Structures are given as C-alpha cells and as structure tokens.
C-alpha cells in the first residue's frame, strides 16, 4: 500500500463523485444541481423526522458515496485490487450487506480479479467442497464407528467448542448452523494435519457466518441476523446453505493459510507475534513497557488470546467486522498489521495501567479490557493510530526482532 499516498490523504476522507460530462450546458447543469439539491434536502428532512441526527445524516451520505465507489471498482472487467484495498481499508459500510460479502471474497482471493472467470471459479469451488463433504460424510454420520482415535479426538473437541460459539445468538445455536460449523472445522482440520484443529477456530468462523448470512438476508443488520429464528432460517434452500458453507470453508482456509505457523505444534507463530508486539510497546511507550516489566507481567498472560482469535473476544461483532475490513485490505493484515493494532490497543490504556499498583489488578484489567461500549469511531481511531505507528517504527522493530543492529 502506498504510504505516502495514504498520509497525503486523510484515511477517512470522503469519496468524491465524478464530475458531470464536459458537454453538458450550463443551464442543464444548474437545473440538475437544483433537482439534486432539492432531493437531498427532502431526504435529509425525512431522516430528521425519523430521529436521525445531522451527524448520522452526514455519515449516511458518506457511506452512500463509498458504496457507489466500491460498486464501480468491483464492476470493472478487471478489478483493481489496490483501489479496492484503499477504499475498504476505511471501512465497508454496513448499510448494504451485499457489498461487504463481495469485497471480502475479492480481498481474500476467493473471487478472481477477472470478472469473466467469476462464475466458473464459484462453481469449481462448490464442486470441490461437495466432493470433500462426500468423502467425510460417513464419518460425520457415524463418528464412533468410522473415525480413528486421532480423528475422534478432533471431532469431540469441535463438538465441545461449537456450542460455546456465541451462545446468546439463536443463529449460532441453530442445529443446522452447528452442523455446518462442525463440518467446516472437521474437514479443514483433517486436510491440514500440520496444525489440525486448534481451539479458537470456531471463533474465527463467526465473522464469516455473519457476513455471508447477511448477504442472503440484506434487509437485516448485524444485530438482527444474530437473532435469526427457525422460521426465517427455513427460507434458505439447501443449495443456498451449501453455497454459504462453501464460502465459509474457503474463507477460513485463505485466512489460516496466511498464519498457519500460529497453529502448528507449540504455536511458534503466536510466540513470535507476542515478542514483536512487546518490542513495539517498548519502542513507542518505554514507560509503560518498564512499568509492566516491574510487575513481571508476561504478555502471554493477556495477549495470547488476542493473537489466537484476532481480538474476536475483545470487541463487539460490528467492530470486528470493521477491524477485519482493514486486515483484509492490508497485504499482511493478520500476520503483521495486527501486531500494531494489539500494541496500540494496549497503549490506549497506558495511563490507567500505570496508575495501578497491584499485579492482580493489572492482570485482571489486561484480560478484560473495557471495550464493550466502543464505537465504530473508536475503532477507526485505533486503526489510524496503529497505521501511524507501523509507518514510523516498522523498520526498526523488524531489525531488532531479527537480532540485527538498529
């Protein structure tokens, strides 16, 4: 991503619409402007009547422009991935659920950049996943009889973890969803023996389920899709459910392919990430670093979960989707940029932490950060600060972590 370009423009700058054609007469232009202004004013009045604040209206108009720009980019015969990354980094508006689903599939590499290949790729992926389902069908129906000891161990752990996946959500507690989640995780684990199943994989599937189910229920929002009831669920055909499950499987695969050493034996990738995060904190806020060191705070005690589940358990779902918009838009979003986000999250509470005087007080706070009431604006600010830190310190952090002279 072009750093200079990103800093020259505020990362939250609105997308400017195209100018009208040059051959348009001044009279026609004035008439069109008047019509558009009246239309916009009327829409604003309606929004105010509905109880929306002027800030809400402004954000809505900005989001509409972003959606329009994303649609323009994604409708090209050959999609400019750099353009798409730049716009999605700022946050994909939730008003149109189809947009986020489409963008994630492109950014993950599930969809080809060449538009004419899209349908054939989708069908090939679907056929491939159905073949895998057929291979493991008998085992999943009769686990005790068909699976060997190692497979049964994986299956039982998945069965144990899945009911804990958003237990307050009727969507995730639906029996069909539980089976879909089990099948996705079991097939992935058996096809990736280097890591197998690791606790937390069920959490990594949460954003994908929400985004791809919203795609099929565009009239809903993040909160209402989590409350999807049995009658609404039954509206989806088996073919549609297979399509969703296929997309979730390959999305998880694309994500884990980027960070697989996080989940191999002894999880060396996570150990390395935690060490790098510690170096970032030392560089950016040496006073906080020394303060935590004085109390012998081990970063593993509080941020292992941050690395293992990519902050899914630390923030409300809508903020995780916003966070992952940025991660998918970064070339090394999960393996590198995530470290700066985690460090910046810790630095956000620097003064509070330095005011604490007991080890137990510190560790309890670090394991339960007060982020439940954070807003999208708070997440935007966290991402902006994280990016600034990355630009300013990334070279020296990498050199130090590699054991070289700075």
Question: Where is each model-derived feature located?
Answer:
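Alpha-helical recognition domains of nuclear gene-regulatory proteins
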Residues: 15, 69-72, 87, 106, ...
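Alpha-helical interaction elements in eukaryotic regulators
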Residues: 59-69, 80-84, 95, 99-100, ...
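Extended, Lys/Glu/Leu-rich amphipathic alpha-helical scaffolds
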Residues: 56-65, 230-301, 332-406
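Glycine-rich ThDP/TPP pyrophosphate-binding loop and its adjacent helix/strand module
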Residues: 321, 325
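Aromatic-anchored, charged helix-turn/loop surface patch used as a conserved interaction hotspot
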Residues: 116-117, 121-169, 244-302, 306
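Intrinsically disordered, low-complexity regions enriched in proline, serine, glycine
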Residues: 115-116, 217, 221, 265, ...
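Extended serine/threonine-enriched, polar tracts that run as long, contiguous segments within proteins
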Residues: 312-318, 328
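N-terminal transition regions in large eukaryotic proteins
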Residues: 1-194, 205, 209-241, 400-406
């Amino acid at each position: 991503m072009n750093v200079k370009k990103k800093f020259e423009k505020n990362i939250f700058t609105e997308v400017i619409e195209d100018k009208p054609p040059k051959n348009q007469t001044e009279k026609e232009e004035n008439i069109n402007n008047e019509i558009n202004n009246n239309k916009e004013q009327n829409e604003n009045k309606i929004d105010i009547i509905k109880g929306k604040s002027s800030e809400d209206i402004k954000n809505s108009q900005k989001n509409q422009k972003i959606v329009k720009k994303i649609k323009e980019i994604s409708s090209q015969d050959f999609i400019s991935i750099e353009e798409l990354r730049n716009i999605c980094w700022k946050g994909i508006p939730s008003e149109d659920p189809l947009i986020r689903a489409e963008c994630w599939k492109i950014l993950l590499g599930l969809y080809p950049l060449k538009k004419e290949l899209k349908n054939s790729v989708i069908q090939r992926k679907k056929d491939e996943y159905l073949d895998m389902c057929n291979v493991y069908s008998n085992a999943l129906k009769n686990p005790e009889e068909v699976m060997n000891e190692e497979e049964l161990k994986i299956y039982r752990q998945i069965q144990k973890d899945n009911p804990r996946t958003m237990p307050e959500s009727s969507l995730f507690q639906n029996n069909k969803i539980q089976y879909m989640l089990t099948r996705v995780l079991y097939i992935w684990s058996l096809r990736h023996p280097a890591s197998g199943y690791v606790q937390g994989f069920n959490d990594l599937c949460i954003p994908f389920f929400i985004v791809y189910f919203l795609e099929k229920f565009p009239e809903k929002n993040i909160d209402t899709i989590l409350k999807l009831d049995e009658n609404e669920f039954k509206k989806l055909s088996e073919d549609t459910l297979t399509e969703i499950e296929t997309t979730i499987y390959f999305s998880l695969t694309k994500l884990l392919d980027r960070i697989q050493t996080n989940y191999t034996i002894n999880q060396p990738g996570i150990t390395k990430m935690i060490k790098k995060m510690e170096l970032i904190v030392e560089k950016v806020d040496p006073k906080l670093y020394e303060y935590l060191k004085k109390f012998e705070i081990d970063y593993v005690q509080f941020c292992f979960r941050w690395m293992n589940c990519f902050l899914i358990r630390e923030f409300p779902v809508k903020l995780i989707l916003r966070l992952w918009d940025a991660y998918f838009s970064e070339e090394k979003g999960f393996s590198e940029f995530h470290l700066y986000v985690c460090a910046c999250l810790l630095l956000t509470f620097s003064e509070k932490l330095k005011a604490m005087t007991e080890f137990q007080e510190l560790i309890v706070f670090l394991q339960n950060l007060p982020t439940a009431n954070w807003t999208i604006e708070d997440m935007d600010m966290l991402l902006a600060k994280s990016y600034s830190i990355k630009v300013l310190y990334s070279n020296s952090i990498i050199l130090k972590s590699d054991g070289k002279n700075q």
